[in-house]
């Protein structure tokens, strides 16, 4: 699992490097392509070491201590011990859209982030199920590739945004022979596709595995199922408006549901299928599922 994670993370970095070099070549030839190569190396370095901070900053997430969130911290610490993990840091996102995600480069540098809305609508058992799900992502080392993919996809979408403006304003420049405008149009069209490919590197099956892990760590598969239903329903009526859709795969449920651009980044299996699997897990654990 560790080797697979490193290979997939390396592949993502190679894709970004190739994309930036291609853009540089389109706009300025080999010299600009080399400059973009150097920029890509720097970006890859920053992404590996600081992508968790980048993602947390997109949501104004604030790291809290045990004094500020005693019940949440107690749940995280207890379940982390049960999972054989170091206690991750805890962050709270100031939004009423209920959701949660885990980030970081490894279990020793992990953060579990939850929204204010999640703390408001879930009971303790349901919250334990959600935290167990996120801790499983940490234990399975999904967090590095997920966080790196989010940072890279976000950067690529920003490139597409800039390229659209270059294409618009460049078309009014009489000194432009049309080459840069054409290049900008190509970037504007192809960059979102590249972002989707990066998102596709995050397997939807990881959510099923995290659901199972969350159910077993918390010992309450019915509570996780109930939490998923509550979050899904809330997101349908109150999708997240802030943040970056490139991070959708990191959340326990896609928080941008209903926004057209978010569908490009949908990496979650249907919630109904996840709940059905939790029913089977409950039976395996000796419970009679009533959800």
Curated annotation (Swiss-Prot):
It comes from the Archaea. Binds 1 zinc ion per subunit. CDD domains: M48B_HtpX_like (cd07336). One of its GO terms (molecular function) is metalloendopeptidase activity. The chain crosses the membrane at residues 1-21, 23-43, 143-163, 182-202. The active site is at 134. Its EC number is 3.4.24.-. One of its GO terms (biological process) is proteolysis. Pfam families: Peptidase_M48. It is found in: Cell membrane. It is a multi-pass membrane protein. InterPro entries: HtpX_protease, Pept_M48_protease_HtpX, Peptidase_M48. Zn(2+) binds at residues 133, 137, 207. Keywords: Cell membrane, Hydrolase, Membrane, Metal-binding, Metalloprotease, Protease, Transmembrane, Transmembrane helix, Zinc. GO terms for cellular component: plasma membrane. Its main location: membrane. Its cofactor is Zn(2+). PANTHER family: PROTEASE HTPX, PROTEASE HTPX HOMOLOG. Belongs to the peptidase M48B family. This is Protease HtpX homolog. It comes from Thermococcus gammatolerans (strain DSM 15229 / JCM 11827 / EJ3).
């Amino acid at each position: 699992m560790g080797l697979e994670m490193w290979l997939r993370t390396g592949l993502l970095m190679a894709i970004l490097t190739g994309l930036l070099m291609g853009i540089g070549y389109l706009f300025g030839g080999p010299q600009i392509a080399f400059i973009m190569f150097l920029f890509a190396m720097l970006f890859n370095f920053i992404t590996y070491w600081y992508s968790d901070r980048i993602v947390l900053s997109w949501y104004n997430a604030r790291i809290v201590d045990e004094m500020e969130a005693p019940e949440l911290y107690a749940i995280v610490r207890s379940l982390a011990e049960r999972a054989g993990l170091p206690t991750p840091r805890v962050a709270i996102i100031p939004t009423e859209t209920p959701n949660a995600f885990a980030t970081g480069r490894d279990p020793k540098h992990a953060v579990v982030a939850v929204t204010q809305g999640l703390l408001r609508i879930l009971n303790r058992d349901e919250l334990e199920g959600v935290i167990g799900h996120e801790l499983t992502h940490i234990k399975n080392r999904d967090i590095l590739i997920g966080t790196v993919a989010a940072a890279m996809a976000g950067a690529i979408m920003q490139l597409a945004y800039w390229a659209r403006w270059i294409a618009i304003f460049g078309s009014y420049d009489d000194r432009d022979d049309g080459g840069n405008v054409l290049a900008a149009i190509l970037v504007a069209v192809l960059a979102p596709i590249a972002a989707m490919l990066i998102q596709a590197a995050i397997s939807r099956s990881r959510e099923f595995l995290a659901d199972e892990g969350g159910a077993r760590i918390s010992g309450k598969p019915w509570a996780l199922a109930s939490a998923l239903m509550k979050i899904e329903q809330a997101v349908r009526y109150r999708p997240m408006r802030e943040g970056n859709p490139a991070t959708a795969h990191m959340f326990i449920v896609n928080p941008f549901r209903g926004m057209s651009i978010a569908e490009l980044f949908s990496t979650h299996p249907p919630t109904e299928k996840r709940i059905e699997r939790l029913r089977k897990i409950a039976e395996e654990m000796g419970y009679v599922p009533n959800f």
